[in-house]
Amino acid sequence: MNFSPLPNRVIDAPKHLKTRMIQVRSSYFGYSLVIRPTSIFVGAPRAQSTLESQGSINETGAVYRCPLASGSCSHYVLNDKLNKQFQWLGGSMDGGTKDTDKLLVCAPRFFVPKNKNYGQMRGICYWVRDTVADTPPLSDVRTISLIPSQAEEHFMLELGLSAHVTDDNSGFLIGAPGVRSWKGSVLVHRGEDLAAQGSYAVKMLDSWDWVKNHFTYVGYALSSGYFSSNNRTSLLYVTTAPSSVLNTGKAYIFDVVGEIVRKLHVFHGEQLGEYFGYSVVAEDLNGDGLTDVVVSAPLNALGDSYDVGAIYVFINKGLFKFEKKIIRLPLSSGARFGSSLSKVGDINHDGYNDLAVGAPFAGNGAVFIFLGSEHGLRDEPSQRLDAPSREPGPYGAHMFGQGLSRGSDIDGNGFNDLAIGAPGAEAVYLYRAYPVVKIHATVRSESRAIRPEQETITVTACYRLETTSKARQMQQQELTFRMTIDELLQRVSFAPMRTNEVSFQAQAGLSGSCRNFSVGVHYTGGIFTPIDLELHYELAKKIPHSHEAFCESCAVVDPLEPKYATGTLSFMTGCAAHVCVSDLQLSSKDVNSSFIFGSLEVLSFSYEITNSGEPAYVAQFNVTSSARLPFAKVPGNCRVRHEVMLCDLNGGRALARGDSESLTIIFDVTQLSGQSLTIEAAVSSAGMDQNPKDNTMSTTISLREYAEIDASGGPIDGHIALKEYPYSAEVNNSYEFKSHGPSIIDELTVYVDVPIAYTVTGSAGIKSIFNISSLQMQATHGSELVPIKLYDQTNTLAKEYPLEDSSRRANRKRRELQQDQYAIMPDVNISDILTKENLPANRTLVLDCLRGNWTICVRSQMRVQLKPEQPIDLRISFKVDLNDFVNTFDYLVIFTNVEMFKEGDSTSIALKRNLKPNVIFNYSETPLPIWYIILSLIAGHLLLGAMTYILYKLRFFKRGKKEELKRLLEEHRSETKEPATDCEGNQEEINVEMHSDLEN
């Protein structure tokens, strides 16, 4: 928006510095940038060294300090020893914008050979406390490396692929995405860690238990901010893992407690292979004091175009809830929008921080400036800065925008400037920012109505400037105006030229100025149509769009600010006096006194305006809300500015006696919050009103949350049988808490009570069924882990899930939950369980936290923002020890109870439970007596013999078919003659064979 359209200084890679090795390809001068008040630090990761000690080492990489005044760069030496071939020094670099801030520089490809065949790409980093001196004494340079490891999973550490210095200068982060077979990790250095002198090796955090897969690249990009709405001074960290979850990518907000890494929130990419997490920036974009997150995905595809790029904007709504918006631009394939991100501060001084986004392969490269706003980052860029040259250089594409500095005011005009690196062109471009001014202008007449005999009227144009710049020349600017009046009907005109348009220039300052114009009235026909006035304005002096020097006296105006002002006048007639006295009455109908969040996306109000007096000229209706709600629909006769709707009644014509008009105003309530909403409406006209009290109406609506919630679940493994000593078992339960809306319940407290012991009847003894140390709980809401606090039977905090430093949880008590603070729907009774499961009442022990006075329970507490149809999944496991139980009872029934509570509102929740209990029973096997077996064998043999005899008597074993065939054969022989002698042998053989067949 207010950056110079062309660079004001170009800093080229230093050619005057002598190197022994020839530079055969681009040094990537400008790959990383850190801007300071008088100089720019430039990383050139493929540069040849100027040091004699490294004269034979190829492409060590270098960092240069380039004074802003001369642009003549010098080698900023951080180390002059060891073999640093192809180490990519300057591949990542970060630091604040003051010379007293730390400077962190890394060489992620620093290689340590082990033998002739292999080595370790460990990476190495250097940091200095400040850059006050032109060159740092090498003794003041701290070197950071990792503790060597021979494990293969640590051969490609790439320490320093990303580097980040916190905004408060208290510490820094270094990414190592190659650790543990490319699972990745982050090195966190805080104030207490920065006292070491010289070189030192550090241990990488290993407690990233929630990173399960290899090749996720945790630590690829880094940032930090203040994300917690409960503790706005707690600095938390952000890292990305662009290869997580089937290459859709993730980003994490995390904290470090001791050596434990706590995951607090996860952001997800959407598109396969988009490289979500290539860059990340944490910045408060909407001015609410909570840090928001922007994550880039430069390989995001748009339609048939590949690698166009996108940025994901996550606006922090508190309680680690973020509102997501994806910004894409209509760029060509391969532009890689989002390859670099940089926070440039509030460049236009509107109270919201802004962002620079690089697309280094959009032609020779481009940088887009996005402005912050009350609702976060604006959808469209306010400015596009293209590479100064469109022709490819000797090393190919310029990659303009690959390197971006932070925003810093280097010229003292109060507005942040920006440095942009083009490593393919080996150049850095400096863009200075112009001051921003705001023009306030109005146009009005001495009276809002023209009397019948009136021949002239006076129109006044007023104007002034508003700016945060302290420069006197910025507080006084020449403005160009163009004013029009009644261009269509030409009933009036500016005197004496008798024209409907007049132009003039005027000097505007911080205090208001006005200019009067005489307007002649020529025609009184068409008196029911109002006269329109428009005043167009702009700065007279334009910023140069050429390679001229920076214009020190120029300013810019936000392009989204109004460029003209309007006014209306009307003809007054049909009234008893010069001023019409109307009687406008405003009423509403069908207004509900309460509203449930989420029940509707829009809220409608119907108004009726009636005039019972003289004609009302220039009758207008305006409406706004206490929450400054946006309007879902704007009628054609209405316009909106700053969440106030102004409507011209009766099409701009006079509203006569007895006339009425109805309007329906529709508000968008998707973002509505609070306890009440007030709608202010009013009507007015050019004349006076008999009863001004009925011209306004204030409607207050109470707001409340309401949700119907189902709590269901129970044992995963069903009933558990204890067969033998030691009578212990693992109990695993799964529960789901699902809201059916309609409202989102903010800060819902969920209590889960689990029986842990019981008191013995008739004594003071207590028997435990499991040890609290074996109790494990994990709750997820969406993809996020929900923090759980576990209180023991004395109401003392015993555990927190995920586990955290025990020193932080000592002696904290839970708040007691009163029975009338929640609504419970009918639940299952203990007697129903005994009947349904057919359990003997005298041999069954039922433990129920809600009903049994003998039951001792532990209570867990969760606080979440519960959205409709986004359930909480809770897993509970514990190991029961019932060695003492089996001698007293055969069955144990354990009821896990759930209660929910919304502080300050006892009617916002309707809880329906369907929770199945755990049933555990003692299963014993009694050995079978030997005489049972003997009697069974004897009885079996007797039964078999009896059945065989019966079948024999029934001729079951008689072969009747065989006897019949034999008889038929004998009859056949007796009826035929004997065969001849020479055939006798054969005949006998045949008979024998036939007989054999019959036998068979």
Curated annotation (Swiss-Prot):
Which segments show compositional bias classed as Basic and acidic residues?
971-980
All ranges on the Cytoplasmic side of the membrane: 951-1000
UniProt superkingdom: Eukaryota
Q: Where are the FG-GAP repeats?
A: 15-74, 75-137, 145-198, 199-261, 262-323, 324-379, 386-448
Provide one Gene Ontology biological process annotation. oocyte growth
Alphabetized, the UniProt keywords read: Cell adhesion, Glycoprotein, Integrin, Membrane, Receptor, Repeat, Signal, Transmembrane, Transmembrane helix
> Briefly, what is this protein's role?
Possible role in cell-cell interactions. Minor involvement in the establishment of the oocyte anterior-posterior length.
Name of the protein: Integrin alpha-PS5
